[in-house]
Amino acid sequence: MSTTTPDLALDAVVDLDVPGPTISRHLYGHFAEHLGRCVYEGFWVGEDSDIPNVGGIRTDVVEALRELAIPNLRWPGGCFADTYHWRDGVGPAADRPRIVNTHWGDVVEDNAFGTHEFMALCDLLGTAPYISGNVGSGTVQETADWVEYLTRGDDSPMARLRREHGRDEPWGVSFFGIGNEPWGCGGNLRADQFASLARQHATYARDHGGNRLVRVAAGASDDDYAWTETLMQQVAKLGDAEPRDLWQMVSFHFYTFAGTWGDKGAATEFTRDEYWATMRKALDVRRIIAGHSAVMDAYDPEARLGLALDEWGTWWNVERDTNPGFLYQQNAMRDALVASVHFDAFHDHARRLRLANIAQTVNVLQSMLLTDGAKMIKTPTFHAFAMSAGHHDAASLPVRERVARATHDVDGTPVGTVSASASTKDGAVLVSLTNLDPDAPATVRVDLRGRAVSDPVATVLAADDPAAHNTFDAPDAVAPRPLDGVTVTDGVLTAELPPAAFATVRLTLAS
């Protein structure tokens, strides 16, 4: 494998006076499944725990996640959602039945964390709830009742039941998932089978009072565009002015790993070849987003329906001596770079892509946080999210290359070594820059045209080794720091990025 590096790893233009689509803050969403130690131990410790908590919810985790201004949180799954019956998780905790988590570790849980606890968590986080309904093993009536229980405010049967359980006012629910991975753990259904079920569940997931649900129809794995087309055919016909109002988004899932599905590679022990295989896989998300978008464009040219990537992130082999069903993995600088190139892809596809959820928030897959008893650490991925918060609800600014960027050959495929995106809001511009080359710095130049800019403030997340990661003994081994040497001369931003680094530069727009 070889690297082709021009004098400038990136030489690009950004027209500040030609903003593009808004980057929905919901592209920075998160995911909490009843899986391993995500909900139990990660979020929920119970009111009797010595770990500081509010109503059983860990205080340190809430405070850390509030730093990210997380816009939405998906729950209770995942595969778990299609075995979850919501009535098991309401009412007095002592009366809730125990259930077996058949998908994840075959462990027994006591339903201590249910609907009321999840909604309390969302209130503490200041985030929008994204609830996944049970299509795989549940009934249409269950879906209808759960939505009524959550969102109806009058004297209806489910509203009365909610009040019996201690909650007078209805909650606001932003997103409701119609199933999860129905082609696999959600029922092993064909696309046409699921489409019929989804139409029923979506019909009875009603809007009550002033609450307006965004219904997300469970979609494809990776680049299964035929699945997306089947779902689009259910709500629109070619040439129709508007899609039918059954669901407002169609989802897909895409995970990044270095090896095969059966042997994905280790989180912190990997070769350079495995590193570059990871980056090639991560960058492929652009092709897949574009493919699903093209299918949707044929049926919905005005982009009234959104595309959702409601599971994404790195998936490695579990850490040694941990339950293989708990999906616990460390989180290295490499993971943060996978996140940053996804963000750039999201920004560039903001017209159609409206929602994304990284898997998962605590102790599972590409986590923001890891916990061990009362201890908690932030991962490099947490820092990548924090550095990118300025893109939430900003207007995207396309980054146009003037010359071809540097590339690295991965088994005959040229993989770009630099990724970039930009946005503007509130009188400022935020430029994101990623150097994927783990062995060489990258000089980048971005010509910011159309508006005057000043006062660059640059932050970088980098490490000497892309396998570097934070531990409970060294929680700040990988942490953001100021990036020196960034200049703006006659509107041209110049910066040198360290190897394997993610940087953001905030600039002030002239009034």
For the regions a language model picked out, list residue spans one by one.
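Anion-binding catalytic surfaces of enzymes that hydrolyze or transfer phosphate/sulfate esters
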Residues: 245-247, 251-261
